[in-house]
Each structure stands twice: as structure tokens, then as C-alpha cells.
């Protein structure tokens, strides 16, 4: 005998016989048994679509209807009674000495009518639709009784309209339903009355009772007179076998294909699996067989319900007592930026817990939405028309900080706008401005107010250190111009400066005094030993009202004919004095520092112009330039393209005459700037004896600017040189203790100023 059975079990048994698809499809029955919005996503999500006879079963139809109505939880309690164990001996007889199968002649006739090469449609019409896809091997007959409760948790948590707090209908909880379900088999009648009363009063539950077979009879004395039913449970399993085992070998594979197409594709197409993905190859009459429109529509409706729930969660958060109490505690006498609100937020533990509750609810909601969206894309990937998906954006703490600002500053005249901290303005509904309130002053560091004015909170009352109050605003206490103390810039533009340096124009030459005990200008000398020379301005004696800036250096060096000597120059700069010990070495050709440029002159001798161009980028103060001249011998290396240099004293033949050298002239290019030492001394005197209130701060600001501008012109290096101390020591003739006191006062004052960063310097002058 052949038994029909629900397609979920049919599919699991049938697939076990099709070897190439076994590993891919073993999870189908598990997916069918899961809740629609919680099952694991896989290439076979389409199995839960409206395809095949499985979706025509009563149990699944009830399940889908309840799910679409919002019933998200199901409680089921049941008991069963198994009396008779039945077995099918058809397969056993076939394997026993070739005995004929005890099958109906009609079944054999339909097999013969199929022929040797039937189409899938012929197999479906002649076998599957008449006899099903499986037959029963063994089962248990008996009876069962069950109670199923579908619960809508959202409606269950809401109190019925018009009900009082003391009524029983308003106190229904999940615990109550648990207790009622557990008492069903103890006191069936009273339990059903109670459940039906709750179902009518709250519409939050749906109750279904099933009683079949002998167990469902009220009179247990006459069990044999009641027709038994198949009992399926972990203890009483139904064993099915695919119908193809009863067919000839040439029909078995085609039958499996036809059965899968019938179950999975509802006979609207051919079932195909490829690369771990399965779908239906639709027939011409059913172009949308892969598109489960009903399931897609249900999921879109679920997304709409999620959007409504999302709005309700946010609205409940704004209407909560914790949110309202937090808003009342916010200070109104100064402007609250998002950082300040966040700090106050972290201080309110009740408000934090309420926000965490909102976050947890939102996370669960968005996880559910993402599962639905993933499933929706999976089901609709072969639809001709893709679904439109719109989900609300997740609101972070930054959104709520701006939302709180909107409640504070954009909530006038019954209109709520949106506040922007960047523009410090409100965007009101319908492009109006009536929602904007008067914004209080901003309290903070730097140019922000120290306090707001008590009579008008939109204006500053007091300011921070380094700022002054002007017309209700805090403006920086800008130091007066330092140009009358010391100059820094020239009127020449960069291009003009570059042109004059290239031409070695005498208009930018600084006339310095040449001093050397080792040599004289325009005189030949033996270059075997190091020669020392210097160019000094002696400003303390001759130019006390000027400081000088070096832009370049030029030397004209001549050698005797056929000389292999190569001049090597080392340059040291003393910014405001004359000694070598307080000079810094010029890093020629290191990193991005300029290198010497040699230009051959049209003279009988080997004469070259050696030019070092600093320009505006590398310009610096100078008082004395120390130049050390060494020479080396240039010889050809082992390779013709290489050159080897020797020191003259290290040459193989020290007695050999290496030639002579002379320097025709040395020029320093730069410019001189105004310098008033007496005015700076008077400025320093105000640190101890201020003229008026506030003049000490003004003097400190001016000295800070002079210090920073002087030190900014220090040579390149990891740390700046302390040129300002050299200026105080050599040009103002201050003692070491006075210099230390002034530097300490400037550092202490600079630390009080807002948004300032002090820097470390390297001492140059003792």
C-alpha cells in the first residue's frame, strides 16, 4: 500500500537517495521547522516561499497566518497514545527470492504507460499526483491531543482600553499563559474557558485545540470503535521511503527529479542545483515561479511594522520620566555644547540606564530587520521586479545630543526645529524662524566667555586670561606692534630677492670688516694648512641701532694652473656677537639646506665664484661670519668616473709643490633692520614696575612676540636655538641672571595663555 504524507518529511527522505544533492539539502527540514524571521539564512531560503504542496498543508497555513497577524510566540502542550505498530512488507518481499511486489495493478499499469523515456510532466501527472512521492515503511497508530497558544507580545503588554487597573484582564502575562497551558490536562474545561475569555478580551492570543484518535475520545471504554491516526513524536517516529525504490532502474533518477520539481517548484518549473545554489527553471507559463510574491509582501509589511515600532521606541524615550528630569536639570545660564551635555549625561545614572534600555531594544529591532532584509534579498534575487526596502537610520548618542540642543534652543512658539552647533543656528519647520530662542553665551577656554552677563545671558560678563571684554565679546589682548623695537622684514619680494642674489647685486651687500691672521685678500698663500678668516660688523661699536640678516655669501677663489687642489669651506655664524664659541655651524648640503654653487670666471687663472644662496627660506641673524678654509687633492680613482680626495698632508709626497691659492674678495649679502635697545630695556623694566594696570601683561605679550620671532629665524635642526637670549646678552648687555629671570617670566605667562604650546630651545650663548 502507498501512503501520502506531508511534503516536509517527503523531501527529507527523497533527497537521501539522490547522492549528488545530499550534502546540500540536509538542512531543509530544519529550516521548515524554524520561525520565519529567525531561521538561518542559506541558499535554500526559497523553501519557505509559497511553493510546493508543503505550503498547502493545514499546519503550515495556520502557522503563516498567525505569523502575519503578529503572533510571534507559540506555546504547545500535547500528549499522545500509541497502540498499534504497523510495518510495510512491500520492499522486503521484493528482496525475498524475487517475489512479486504486492502492489495495485493500476500502479503497474501507470508505470508501463510511462515508457522508457518519460518527461518530468508525465511522471508528475501519472505517478506523483496519484500516489505521492513516498510510501510508509513503519509507523504507530493511536491518538493525540494538543493545545496551541499563539501570543502577540506587543498586544499582551498593552492594557485594554476602558479597563481598570484592578481587573483581571489587564494582568495577563506570559507567566499566566504558562500556568494555564500547564493545567490543560488537569482541568481542561476551566482552562479553556479562561483562555477563551482572555482571547476575547485582549485579542493578544489565539487558542487552537486538536483532539484526534482514541486519546481524544471522551469515553475511554470504547477505544476500539474509534479510528486511530498516525502518531508522530520523538518516541513514535514515522519512517518513509522514497517511491522510486519501487520503480524500475531506468525511472528512478527521472522520478527523483520530477519529485523535487513537484515539491520545490510546484510543477511550475524544473528544479536545478548548481554551485551550492538551487532554484527553479521556470516554464513559459510560469515566468515568476522563483518569485514568492506572498512571502515578499509579508516581509515588506514586517519592515513597515518595524519602522512603526522604531518610531514608538524613540517617542517613548522622549516621553520617559528620566528624559524629562534630565532636561529640567540642564543649566540655562550658558550655552551647552555637545561635550558639556555628554558630561552631564554621564553624571546621570538613571538617564544612562534608560538610554541603554533604548539601545538594547533598538539592537534587537535592527537585528530582526537585517534578517528580514537578508531573507528578502535572497527570495527576490530571481524576481523580475526587486522589492523597495526602506529602513530608518539608527540613532546614535550624537543624534540625541543634537536633539537635546534642539529642545533647548529651537523649541519656541510650539515649534520644534533642528539645531546645528557648527552654524550656531536653528532650522525651523516650513523655513520659519519663530522656533529659535535666544542663545546664551558660550563658556569655555580661549575666546569663549568665562561667565555670561547676569543682565543679558547672550553676552559675555567676564573673559579668560589673555582676552578682554569688548561689546559683550571676548577678544584677544593683542600686543602692540613690535616694529619700533626691532625689525624683521624687508620691502623686497621673494622674486626680487632671488634676482638680486643671482646677480650678486651690490645693493643688497652688507659691508663687513675682513679679519684674518693667516692670510690676506688678493695674496697667494700655501693652502696646505687650514686658514681662518672672519667677516664682522662690530655693531656694538659702529651700528648699535641695527641688527642684520644674512641672505647669501660669495667668495672668489683662484688657483695656480694645473693645480689639483679642491677648496673645502666650513662656515659658522654668530648672530649677535663675535666669538666662535657662540656660533653655530652652517649645515651646507645637508638635508634640504642649500649647497655651494661654483661658477668659473673668464680669467687666465683657475678662478671660481663660490656662492651660497640662503634666500628668505634660510635667512638668519648674523653679526660675525667665521670661515675656515681647508684644501684637498682631487685624483682619479680606479674607475675613470670616480674621484678620490686626499688631504694635502696625507699625500704620498709631502715635499711636492701642490700649487697656491688666493681669495680675491668675500661678500655678504643681506639687509639691516631697525633695532632700539633702549626701548626694549624700558619694556623689560615694566615687568617689575608696570606703568598702569594691565601694562605688565601688554609688555609680556610684546616680549613673547619678539622672542618667538627671533627664535623662529634659528637654523634648521631638531630643536631651535635660543637666539633671544643671545640678543639680550650681547646687544642689551644684560647679565646671565637677568636673562634667566626674563625667560622664566615669559614661560610662566605663556603657560597661562589659551591654546599656546611652549617649545624647548638649545642654549647658544652662555
Swiss-Prot record:
Classification of source organism: Eukaryota, Metazoa, Chordata, Craniata, Vertebrata
Q: Which UniProt keywords apply?
A: Cell cycle, Glycoprotein, Growth arrest, Mitochondrion, Secreted, Signal
What SMART domains does the record tag this protein with? MACPF
Tissue pattern of expression reads: Expressed in olfactory bulb, cerebellum and neuronal layers in hippocampus.
Q: Which residues are glycosylated?
A: 168, 337, 456, 562, 609, 641
Give the signal peptide, or none.
1-33
Q: Where is the MACPF domain?
A: 74-264
One GO CC annotation: dendrite
**GO terms classed as biological process:** cellular response to retinoic acid; central nervous system neuron differentiation; exploration behavior; multicellular organism growth; negative regulation of cell cycle; negative regulation of mitotic cell cycle; nervous system development; positive regulation of neuron differentiation
Q: Which SUPFAM superfamilies match?
A: Growth factor receptor domain
Q: What is this protein called?
A: BMP/retinoic acid-inducible neural-specific protein 3
Q: Where in the cell is it found?
A: Secreted; Mitochondrion
Role summary: Inhibits neuronal cell proliferation by negative regulation of the cell cycle transition. Promotes pituitary gonadotrope cell proliferation, migration and invasion, when overexpressed. May play a role in cell pituitary tumor development.
Annotated family: Belongs to the BRINP family.
Q: Looking at the keywords, is Signal present?
A: yes
Asked whether the keyword GTP-binding is assigned, the reply is: no
Amino acid at each position: 500500500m502507498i501512503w501520502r504524507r506531508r511534503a516536509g518529511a517527503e523531501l527529507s527522505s527523497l533527497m537521501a537517495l539522490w547522492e549528488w544533492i545530499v550534502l546540500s539539502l540536509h538542512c531543509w527540514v530544519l529550516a521548515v521547522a524554524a520561525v520565519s524571521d529567525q531561521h538561518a539564512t542559506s541558499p535554500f531560503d526559497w523553501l519557505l516561499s509559497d511553493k510546493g504542496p508543503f505550503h498547502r498543508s493545514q499546519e503550515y497555513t495556520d502557522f503563516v497566518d498567525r505569523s502575519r497577524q503578529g503572533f510571534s510566540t507559540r506555546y504547545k502542550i500535547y500528549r499522545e497514545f500509541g497502540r498499534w505498530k504497523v510495518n510495510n512488507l512491500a520492499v522486503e518481499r521484493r528482496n525475498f527470492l524475487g517475489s512479486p511486489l504486492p502492489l495495485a495493478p493500476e500502479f503497474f499499469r501507470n508505470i508501463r504507460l510511462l515508457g522508457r523515456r518519460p518527461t518530468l510532466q508525465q511522471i508528475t501527472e501519472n505517478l506523483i499526483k496519484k500516489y505521492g512521492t513516498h510510501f510508509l515503511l513503519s509507523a504507530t497508530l493511536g491518538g493525540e491531543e494538543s493545545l496551541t497558544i499563539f501570543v502577540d507580545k506587543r498586544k499582551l503588554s498593552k492594557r485594554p482600553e476602558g479597563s481598570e487597573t484592578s481587573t483581571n484582564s489587564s494582568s495577563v502575562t506570559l507567566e499566566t499563559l504558562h500556568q494555564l497551558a500547564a493545567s490543560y490536562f488537569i482541568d481542561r474545561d476551566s482552562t479553556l474557558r479562561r483562555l477563551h475569555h482572555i482571547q476575547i478580551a485582549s485579542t493578544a492570543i489565539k487558542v487552537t485545540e486538536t483532539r484526534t484518535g482514541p486519546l481524544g475520545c471522551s469515553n475511554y471504554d470504547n477505544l476500539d470503535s474509534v479510528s486511530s491516526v498516525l502518531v508522530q513524536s520523538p518516541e513514535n517516529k514515522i519512517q518513509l521511503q522514497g517511491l522510486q525504490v519501487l520503480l524500475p532502474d531506468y525511472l528512478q533518477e527521472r522520478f527523483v527529479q520530477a519529485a523535487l520539481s513537484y515539491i520545490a517548484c510546484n510543477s511550475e518549473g524544473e528544479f536545478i542545483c548548481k554551485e551550492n545554489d538551487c532554484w527553479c527553471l521556470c516554464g513559459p507559463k510560469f515566468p515568476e515561479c522563483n518569485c514568492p510574491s506572498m512571502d515578499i509582501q509579508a516581509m515588506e509589511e514586517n519592515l513597515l511594522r518595524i519602522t512603526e515600532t522604531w518610531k514608538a521606541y524613540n517617542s517613548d524615550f522622549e516621553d520617559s520620566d528620566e528624559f524629562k528630569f534630565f532636561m529640567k536639570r540642564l543649566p540655562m545660564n550658558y550655552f551647552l555644547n555637545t561635550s558639556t551635555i555628554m558630561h552631564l549625561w554621564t553624571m546621570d545614572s538613571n538617564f544612562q540606564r534608560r538610554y541603554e534600555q533604548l539601545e538594547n531594544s533598538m539592537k534587537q529591532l535592527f537585528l530582526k530587520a537585517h534578517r528580514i532584509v537578508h531573507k528578502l534579498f535572497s527570495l527576490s534575487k530571481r524576481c523580475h521586479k526587486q522589492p523597495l526596502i526602506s529602513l530608518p537610520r539608527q540613532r546614535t548618542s550624537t543624534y540625541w545630543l543634537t536633539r537635546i540642543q534642539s529642545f533647548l534652543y529651537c523649541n519656541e512658539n510650539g515649534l520644534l526645529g533642528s539645531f546645528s552647533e557648527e552654524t550656531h543656528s536653528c532650522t525651523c519647520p516650513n523655513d520659519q524662524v519663530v522656533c529659535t530662542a535666544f542663545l546664551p553665551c558660550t563658556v569655555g577656554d580661549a575666546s569663549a566667555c568665562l561667565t555670561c552677563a547676569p543682565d543679558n545671558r547672550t553676552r559675555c560678563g567676564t573673559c579668560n586670561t589673555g582676552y578682554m571684554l569688548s561689546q559683550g565679546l571676548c577678544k584677544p589682548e593683542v600686543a602692540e606692534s613690535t616694529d619700533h623695537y626691532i625689525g624683521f622684514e624687508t620691502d623686497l619680494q621673494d622674486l626680487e630677492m632671488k634676482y638680486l642674489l643671482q646677480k650678486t647685486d651690490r645693493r643688497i651687500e652688507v659691508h663687513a670688516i675682513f679679519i684674518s691672521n693667516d692670510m690676506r685678500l688678493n695674496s697667494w698663500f700655501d693652502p696646505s694648512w687650514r686658514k681662518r678668516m672672519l667677516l664682522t660688523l662690530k655693531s656694538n661699536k659702529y651700528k648699535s641701532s641695527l641688527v642684520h640678516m644674512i641672505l647669501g655669501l660669495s667668495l672668489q677663489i683662484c688657483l695656480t694652473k694645473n693645480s689639483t687642489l679642491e677648496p673645502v669651506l666650513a662656515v659658522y655664524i654668530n648672530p649677535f656677537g663675535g666669538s666662535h664659541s657662540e656660533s653655530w655651524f652652517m649645515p651646507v648640503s645637508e638635508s634640504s639646506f642649500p649647497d655651494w654653487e661654483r661658477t668659473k670666471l673668464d680669467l687666465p687663472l683657475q678662478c671660481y665664484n663660490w656662492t651660497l644662496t640662503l634666500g628668505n627660506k634660510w635667512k638668519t641673524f648674523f653679526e660675525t661670519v667665521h670661515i675656515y678654509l681647508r684644501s684637498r687633492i682631487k685624483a682619479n680613482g680606479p674607475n675613470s668616473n670616480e674621484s678620490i680626495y686626499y688631504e694635502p698632508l696625507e699625500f704620498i709626497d709631502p715635499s711636492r709643490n701642490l700649487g697656491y691659492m688666493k681669495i680675491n674678495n668675500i661678500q655678504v649679502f643681506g639687509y639691516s633692520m631697525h633695532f632700539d635697545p633702549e626701548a626694549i630695556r624700558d619694556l623689560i623694566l615694566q615687568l617689575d614696575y608696570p606703568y598702569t594696570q594691565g601694562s605688565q601683561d601688554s609688555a609680556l605679550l610684546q616680549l613673547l612676540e619678539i622672542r618667538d620671532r627671533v627664535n623662529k629665524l634659528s637654523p634648521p635642526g631638531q630643536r631651535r636655538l635660543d637666539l633671544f637670549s643671545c640678543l639680550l646678552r650681547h646687544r642689551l648687555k644684560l647679565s646671565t641672571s637677568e636673562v634667566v629671570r626674563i625667560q622664566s617670566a615669559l614661560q610662566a605667562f605663556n603657560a597661562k595663555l589659551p591654546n599656546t604650546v611652549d617649545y624647548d630651545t638649545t642654549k647658544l650663548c652662555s
